[in-house]
């Protein structure tokens, strides 16, 4: 199964072509939130390197959140535009789960964290072993200070913090656990390849592109400010 994977849910962006779990081609950019300029050229690049066109793609995979509201919208809009002409089925994968797949051969507890600002992180905990990833907690937006409590039951296991919020998570938990570390730089960020692997390894459902929806976990800053303004006016 030829898959086009995409990620633009945070600071980095990536695109990948896989044949099942096997990586064929990949592009990765860490240049800030310029995804509207970089994502489609990366798709063209990975397709060209793989000597494929969108007509050859059996399924598209996109990280559907949590993360940057703008980045998520750009990614979902891009994958819909790419998939609709050929009615290619699509699959949305948690950004945090895609991160965990970076560590699937590490035999560890993956503390996946993204900087959600306001002293919070988007986080989920996974157990990685023998190439498999087992979800232990649901994706959530939480204060980083809650992580030691969440991870307490895994205190005797090796814990690796991964994601663009990994340093925040690490600072929150390093004094509570003996065996906690940061992921290597090369595996620090979510990748389109990880999202594609998750979809394949877990036999996720592929749906019509029009049915793809973003997963934000919390209202946007503008929505929160509007809600606060309304409450003050009541």
Where does each model-flagged region fall?
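Phosphate-handling active-site elements
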Residues: 48-55, 83-93, 206-207
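Acyltransferase
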Residues: 183-234
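Residues at secondary-structure transition points
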Residues: 30-38, 69-73, 77, 94, ...
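Stable alpha-helical structural segments in soluble proteins, enriched in small hydrophobic residues
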Residues: 46-50, 85, 103, 192-205
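N-terminal beta-alpha supersecondary unit
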Residues: 1-66, 141
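Surface "functional belts" at beta-alpha junctions
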Residues: 22, 89-189, 216, 221, ...
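DPxDG-like acidic metal-binding loop motif
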Residues: 61-90, 95
